[in-house]
Amino acid sequence: MDQGKRWIAVPTWRVPGRMEKWHSLIKYLKYRTKDLEQVRYVPHHKVGWAWWTCSRVIFPLKGNSHLEIQAYWNLTPEKGWLSSYSVRMTWYSEGFWTDVTPDCADTLIHSTYFSCFTAGEVRRAIRGEKSLSCCNYPQAHKSKVPSLQFLALVVVQQNDKPQRDNTTRKQWRRNYRRGLRLARQDGRSHKQRGSEPPAQGAYFPGVAKVLEILA
């Protein structure tokens, strides 16, 4: 029996540019702010049996499960796309795995990483007390219908200037800008900022936005 070539097709998301921004932001949040300290980062490497290279970012999640985001380069040389990149997002646990979309990946990451509103924040907002928490991953809530409590807390977080010190919000925005700035720079720029203290409670803009995924 003549055996032809067997193909295994998996869904990937094409990205318009190089992956330095994604890799730099992951390293910044892993080694500088420690928000992703438990995440495993595997730099770009050549796959021995294939013609493409791959990098991996593995997020340990609750319930002994993991989310893995793989970045591929040079997947389709026969079409001349030698500099094209794509990513694959996979959730897996023991004995089961499935591919997920970027919005689902945001929800999975936020279930374990980055701070969010605490349970008592609604009561504090009703009593007019100072807010003690905020959501550093708002993109993770956009894939589902938000509750009235969450919408109210977002409004309080954005507009409640007389009741809370703006230091937290300024630091939040500063962390966000610093993260994206470092994501655009190379390793030399990281060394020049080695004397700066690490920022706490970093803001994460979302998987699709960082990778600039083309739907």
Swiss-Prot record:
Q: Where is this motif: HCCH motif?
A: 110-141
Task: Tell me which domain of life the UniProt entry assigns to the organism this sequence originates from.
Answer: Viruses
- Membrane topology category: Peripheral membrane protein
Q: Where is this motif: BC-box-like motif?
A: 147-156
Keywords recorded for this protein, A-Z:
AIDS, Host cell membrane, Host cytoplasm, Host membrane, Host-virus interaction, Membrane, Phosphoprotein, Ubl conjugation, Ubl conjugation pathway, Virion
Keyword Ubl conjugation assigned to the entry: answer is yes
> Could you name the Gene Ontology cellular component terms for this entry?
host cell cytoplasm; host cell plasma membrane; membrane; virion component
List the residue ranges of the region (Multimerization): 154-167
Q: Which residues carry this modification: Phosphoserine?
A: 147
Phosphothreonine PTM positions read 98
Q: InterPro entries, alphabetically? A: Vif
The places in or outside the cell where this protein is found are: Host cytoplasm; Host cell membrane; Virion
What upregulates this protein?
Expressed late during infection in a Rev-dependent manner.
Explain the post-translational modification: Processed in virion by the viral protease.
Gene Ontology biological-process annotations = viral life cycle
In the record's own words, the domains note is:
The BC-like-box motif mediates the interaction with elongin BC complex. The HCCH motif (H-x(5)-C-x(18)-C-x(5)-H) mediates the interaction with CUL5.
Family membership noted in the UniProt record = Belongs to the primate lentivirus group Vif protein family.
Remarks, miscellaneous: Required for replication in 'nonpermissive' cells, including primary T-cells, macrophages and certain T-cell lines, but is dispensable for replication in 'permissive' cell lines, such as 293T cells. In nonpermissive cells, Vif-defective viruses can produce virions, but they fail to complete reverse transcription and cannot successfully infect new cells.
SUBUNIT field: Homomultimer; in vitro and presumably in vivo. Interacts with viral Pr55Gag precursor and human APOBEC3G. The interaction between Vif and APOBEC3G is species-specific, which may play a role in restricting the replication of HIV to humans. Forms an E3 ligase complex by interacting with human CUL5 and elongin BC complex (ELOB and ELOC).
| Biological function | Counteracts the innate antiviral activity of APOBEC3G. Forms a complex with host APOBEC3G thus preventing the entry of this lethally hypermutating enzyme into progeny virions. Functions as an adapter molecule, recruiting APOBEC3G to the ubiquitin-proteasome machinery. Targets APOBEC3G for degradation through the assembly with elongin BC complex, CUL5 and RBX1. Binds viral RNA and affects the stability of viral nucleoprotein core. May play a role in viral morphology.
**Name of protein:** Virion infectivity factor
Question: What gene makes this protein?
Answer: vif
